[in-house]
UniProtKB/Swiss-Prot annotation:
InterPro entries: aa-tRNA-synt_IIb, aa-tRNA-synth_II, aa-tRNA-synth_II/BPL/LPL, Anticodon-bd, Anticodon-bd_dom_sf, Beta-grasp_dom_sf, TGS, TGS-like. The keyword tRNA-binding applies. This is Threonine--tRNA ligase. It comes from Nitrosomonas europaea (strain ATCC 19718 / CIP 103999 / KCTC 2705 / NBRC 14298). It is found in: Cytoplasm. Belongs to the class-II aminoacyl-tRNA synthetase family. Its cofactor is Zn(2+). GO terms for biological process: threonyl-tRNA aminoacylation.
Length: 635
């Protein structure tokens, strides 16, 4: 007898062993048709999985997040099947699920074209309609290796060769196509109905640039056409908001081949940068931070002591002078410890919060560079807090308050939080880890925040909290971090005199709110579609005259606004007013002031918003009050 317990607490009793599909059939025909897989004692399995002992079972349908992931995984196999049918001789490699879709890497004699993608997607639809049964089989390792070698799939054979000898290998077949996979998968290809191939890119085998270049085909799959259409519309909107396009359109910045991964900031873009930096500088000072500046080039010996030379050297720019090796700093922490070490520290000095807008360089692969989002030269809003173990909770709590306020002021209302706990390989005592993890969790709970644990994902030197923003398109951007460090202070000789007159090593909290200034500005541009809030806009007001008669009056208003601290300019060209309004609205300038004979006579201005809002006529003084209130509130 086999007892299967369902999520509602009811039991289904069977005389013998039973498959997951048979359990679904025993409940209702509708559920049996809808079921895609099962979660047996917490593990995802196929509908064909045999239940031999008393078990807990959750049936997975396309209404579950796991169901959508299984559909996408199966769609990756559908893609590989279609490619193999259309392009014999192609070798398949790996095809995982990613956020909002999947990809599959292929080795083929020529590059795939956009026309090929259309043909592949059409063949995928045909295979879906064949309603092929998807079957799992388990072979021993040697049989699986020989099978894939015999059919010319040498990449698959390599993957299996890396699997331990005694571990069985699972394969999935649909029609005459067989692939290596752990599963689970949908029961029939007809369950994969809504999908679209998106693009082709290059990818190295096993992610190693020393290996051969493969072709990666990206796709997306959904439960319904409505969901897919919404996603595609979102992508379309994201394309319009691409910070690289808007950066050019709004004359904010550019990059060029002579300085890959490094940004040329134009006057308007640098105004945005300065506004953010000034705001952060004032905010940090108001929260007990002191600002420092540390060298960008440091001797190899310091990087060896910190551990970066051993673990991070391939990402560092190295130079040599007078028979000494140096590295341009990829991060600021070793330099901050040197400032802490300069002079005798007492427990009375703690917590000490050292902040720096630190310029860093990392030797990122050229293929990974992407506008402002992935660069080689960047500035971090970095800070390190040196404190005692007993001060961790208080410092974490204060940092969370600070971070939340900053994000709100930049227009982000939703933050996702993850706590990464101790990994298997780590430094520090169990007691230290217990205290640190408890302090981080307690701080999050005291703030009544929703958060999730990432077990074992902490760094070897301490647990961390990650803060991820959601933008106006629902995309996620991991920006803020708070990282405890039990290792670096000791490695670099940091210490303080405790209350009992003994020397102790401080706890070091690495923390950032924006992350990289460059990346955060890119996120802001896309979040606001280039229409930055008034306080951040490089140009806040443009004054437009209708004819030459008002040119002098328009210039007078411009000067008056500038004297009031408003970033204003005038367009006195002899062009139609409708043309000038359209042009400056495209430049995302928040306020457009129109002056004609009537406004000049009444000593007023007619105010329009960049999105076409009509605020009517008002005095310059009234507008200044309105604008200054908006700037102060950071709206």
């Amino acid at each position: 007898m086999t007892v299967v317990r369902l999520p509602d607490g009811t039991d289904r009793v069977f005389d013998n062993s039973v498959t997951v599909r048979e359990v679904a059939e025993s409940i209702s025909p509708g559920l049996a048709r809808a079921a895609l897989a099962g979660k047996l004692n917490g593990k995802l399995v196929d509908l064909s999985e045999q239940i031999e002992t008393d078990s807990d079972l959750v049936l997975i349908t396309d209404k579950d997040s796991e169901g959508l992931e299984i559909i996408r995984h199966s769609c990756a196999h559908l893609l590989a099947h279609a490619v193999k049918e259309l392009f014999p001789g192609t070798q398949v490699t790996i095809g995982p699920v990613i956020e909002n879709g999947f990809y599959y890497d292929f080795s083929y004699e020529r590059p795939f074209t956009p026309e090929d993608l259309v043909a592949i997607e059409k063949r995928m639809q045909e295979i879906s309609k064949r309603a092929l049964k998807i079957e799992r089989k388990v072979w021993d390792r040697s049989r699986a290796i020989n099978f894939f070698k015999d059919i010319g799939e040498h990449y698959k054979a390599q993957i299996i060769e890396s699997i331990p000898d005694n571990e069985p290998v699972s394969l999935y077949s649909q029609g005459d196509f067989t692939d290596l996979c752990r599963g689970p998968h949908v029961p029939y290809t007809s369950k994969i109905k809504v999908f679209k191939l998106m693009k082709i890119a290059g990818a190295y085998w096993r992610g190693d640039s020393k290996n051969e270049m493969l072709q990666r085909i990206y796709g997306t799959a959904w439960v319904s056409n409505e969901e897919q259409n919404n996603y595609l519309r979102c992508l379309e909107e994201a394309e319009k908001r691409d910070h690289r396009k808007l950066g050019k359109q709004l004359d904010l910045f550019h990059t060029q081949e002579e300085a890959p991964g490094m940004v040329y900031w134009h006057p308007k873009g640098w105004v945005v940068w300065q506004q953010i930096e000034q705001y952060m500088r004032q905010t940090l000072a108001g929260n007990g931070y002191v600002e420092i500046r540390t060298p960008q080039v440091l001797d190899r010996s310091l990087w060896e002591s910190s551990g970066h030379w051993e673990n991070f050297r391939e990402n560092m720019f190295i130079t040599e002078s007078e028979n000494r090796h140096y590295a341009i700093k990829p991060m600021n922490c070793p330099g901050h410890v040197q400032v802490f070490n300069h002079g005798l520290r007492s427990y009375r000095d703690l917590p000490l919060r050292l902040a720096e807008f630190g310029s860093c360089h990392r030797n990122e692969a050229s293929g990974a560079l992407h506008g402002l989002m992935r660069v080689r030269s960047f500035t971090q809003d970095d800070a390190h807090i040196f404190c005692t173990e007993d001060q961790i909770l208080g410092e974490v709590t204060k940092f969370i308050d600070l971070l939340n306020q900053v994000y709100i002021n930049f227009g982000f209302s939703e933050t996702l939080i993850k706590l990464s706990t101790r990994p298997l390989k780590r430094v520090g005592t169990e007691d230290q880890w217990d205290k640190a993890e408890t302090a981080l969790a307690t701080a999050l709970n005291q703030k009544e925040l929703n958060w999730e644990v990432q077990p074992g994902e902490g760094a070897f030197y301490g647990p961390k909290i990650e803060f991820t923003l959601k933008d106006s398109l629902g995309r996620k951007w991991q920006c803020g971090t708070l990282q405890l460090d039990f290792s670096m202070p000791a490695r670099l000789g940091a210490g303080y005199i405790a209350e009992d007159n003994t020397r102790k090593i401080p706890v070091m909290l690495h923390r950032a709110i924006l992350g990289s200034m460059e990346r955060f500005i890119g996120i802001l541009i896309e979040h606001h579609a280039g229409a930055l809030p008034l306080w951040l806009s490089p140009e806040q007001v443009i004054i437009l005259n209708i004819s030459r008669n008002q040119a002098e009056y328009a210039q007078l208003i411009t000067d008056e606004l500038k004297q009031s601290g408003i970033r204003a300019s005038s367009d006195l060209r002899n062009e139609k007013i409708s043309y000038k309004i359209r042009e400056h609205s495209m430049q995302k300038i928040p306020y457009l002031m129109v002056v004609g004979d009537k406004e000049m006579e009444n000593r007023t201005v007619t105010v329009r918003g960049r999105a076409g809002q009509d605020y009517g006529a008002m005095s310059v003084e009234s507008f200044v009050v309105r604008a200054q209130e908006e700037i102060a509130k950071r709206l």
